């Protein structure tokens, strides 16, 4: 309805389709330190959707995450620094084939969670179902493309290169 220069818009509540409803709240009650999931017994922060699922337009609670503090942040940072170990840690020195296997295993497990991740994308950032599916699939494709690029880098680095009459085998190191 138009009233002078003021536009008044009326919104009608529309029920969320059942297959997209949040039926179970997520409670993330652990966090990662030194490669281990540590149980969190402190306070939690609620995670709300930008989408309302009530006629009163109340926020939709999706779940809770740990309200980690400074001490946990320092432990996580120290853990990451120790794991990298200035380029001499397990991951940076791992054989290419083992890294690739780890990433392929990860992405295969990730694909098994597609439906829940797609639903959470819809609720957390307001994407529609089709766009959320595309976002997930693009991420999976990107991981596979990165693996293929890494394989190419490894193959190329195994070759001798000639420059100014000098043959060299150039490899990456820590």
Which role does the model predict for each range below?
Residues 53-154:
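Glycine-rich loop-to-alpha-helix module at the N-terminal edge of alpha/beta enzyme cores
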Residues 2-65, 101-105, 137, 152-174:
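Terminal low-complexity tails and localization/encapsulation signals of metabolic enzymes
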